[in-house]
Amino acid sequence: VAPGGGREAGEPLGRHPDVAMVSFTGSTATGRLFLKYAAESNLKRVVLECGGKNPAVVMNDVEDLDLVAQHVVNGAFWNMGENCSASSRLIVHAEVREALLERIGAQLREWRMGDPLDPRNRLGALVSPAHFEKVRAYLDQARTERLAVRFGGATEAGIFVEPTVVDGVSPHSRLFREEIFGPLLSVTSFDDIDEAIALANDTVYGL
């Protein structure tokens, strides 16, 4: 174990001639640095997982919307959405959109926010003040785009952000396209399966 930040641990490992491979999970910017370190040292193998914009696709023939809502909420908001495979995009058939959103709201009302060491709480603070500001900027972006904030959207003392569901998100929106890495679920509706597949695949990320 080599504990430390990027300068103390990451960069030395990336540049060291005796290190044959580095695997990194994190931001695209840092992933590019590891490729640079490898190119400037011993051409070590670099394995990267740099971000995600995972879609949850819900068709109109779904049998149990309550179960779907539970999975969507868990996928989007577990660990405050600070998870590379978080389901941060809900792509839902227009015929069941409203019914599903109602159930998602009911699920979220059961998720209590507070001290993460308290077993009654499901939600805690974000990882850092800097990341809190990044997530808050996306909340501001939703308002700038005049999108419908269906649930949440508020920030609390410290670096807490309510789990937030934003409806009517265009595939051209930053909320649809960029990894937020926080408790913000974007909702985009579709009318047929071909449109759903196209929306799900419309991302630069591998996840």
Regions found by a protein language model. Give the residues of each.
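Short acidic-hydrophobic, aromatic-tinged amphipathic segments that line or gate anion-handling sites
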Residues: V1-G4, V58, V187-D191
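A structured beta-alpha segment of the ubiquitous adenosine-cofactor-binding alpha/beta core
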Residues: V1-M21
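Short beta-strand segments
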Residues: V1-P3, S23-T25, E49-G51
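Conserved N-terminal phosphate-binding loop of PLP-dependent enzymes in the Aspartate aminotransferase
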Residues: L13, F24, V73-A76
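ALDH superfamily catalytic-core signature
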Residues: A29-S170, D192-D194, A198-N201
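Short, solvent-exposed loop/beta-turn-alpha elements that line the ligand-binding surface or hinge
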Residues: F176
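Glycine-rich nucleotide-phosphate-binding loops and adjacent flexible coil segments
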Residues: P183
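Short, intrinsically disordered, charge-balanced linker/junction segments flanking boundaries
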Residues: V204-L207
